[in-house]
């Protein structure tokens, strides 16, 4: 096992040239998941990847597993609810024990924002952050970028575009990673949420009114209300939240005018709470493209860390 290796804990770990390389690789895989070169297949064949997910996941863990299999690697998924952490083993000891088995890469999700940044010092294989607390989810930001790259045609065309994040921005690691990445690429950003769901970001535009966000934006990213991270209820019900912040056909008609606004959501989507059901079937919704691109981008990331 190499003594030095690359990790992906946050998007700032990547140079702009590396981001462009990942977009190029992922674009090929998005067009054809089977377009894995013989050289890559030979180098990655039978490599073992361990998934340590201490929080629930559907899209991320599944797409990493599918990405691994399509590249020819093998994934071991541990059920952390039945692991020795439930018996009192510390996170560091769990990680060290898994690492001692010499996997070729570890993919990790944890409720604590600091977890992967503390554990990386013990890792001599690539460590990929698949979501840490409210701080970072780099592969989600990269697949979202791939989706926008496909739609607008180039990074140059993305520069100067306006994106509004609507919903529980404060508790969203997806928003945090996307904001940092998209700012590097020259996009303008607005955050739309009630005060209790807005982070302290004095240099970023904010609004409490979804109509203002829609008028501002070329791209809307809806975010799930993360009630599991709230100490006290913010709205009496999710229906009350939807009345203020759901992306609906009427709101787009009233405020987007003739703009072809792109609609994104990292999932899971709360239908008719985050986005109106009819809008999820609308041509402007790229939600399923995001899911497909999750496999493609994660194939590119694994190839980048394990082969390049």
Curated annotation (Swiss-Prot):
Gene Ontology cellular component annotations, sorted alphabetically: cytosol
Catalyzed reaction equations: carbamoyl phosphate + L-aspartate = N-carbamoyl-L-aspartate + phosphate + H(+)
Pathway the protein contributes to: Pyrimidine metabolism; UMP biosynthesis via de novo pathway; (S)-dihydroorotate from bicarbonate: step 2/3
Ligand binding (carbamoyl phosphate): 59-60, 109, 137, 140, 267-268
Enzyme class: transferase
Superkingdom assignment: Bacteria
Keywords: Pyrimidine biosynthesis, Transferase
GO BP field: 'de novo' pyrimidine nucleobase biosynthetic process; 'de novo' UMP biosynthetic process; amino acid metabolic process
EC number: 2.1.3.2
One GO MF term attached to the UniProt entry: aspartate carbamoyltransferase activity
Binding site for L-aspartate: 87, 173, 224
Subunit comment: Heterododecamer (2C3:3R2) of six catalytic PyrB chains organized as two trimers (C3), and six regulatory PyrI chains organized as three dimers (R2).
Function: Catalyzes the condensation of carbamoyl phosphate and aspartate to form carbamoyl aspartate and inorganic phosphate, the committed step in the de novo pyrimidine nucleotide biosynthesis pathway.
Family (UniProt): Belongs to the aspartate/ornithine carbamoyltransferase superfamily. ATCase family.
Protein name: Aspartate carbamoyltransferase catalytic subunit
Organism, as annotated: Helicobacter acinonychis (strain Sheeba)
Name of the gene this protein is made from: pyrB
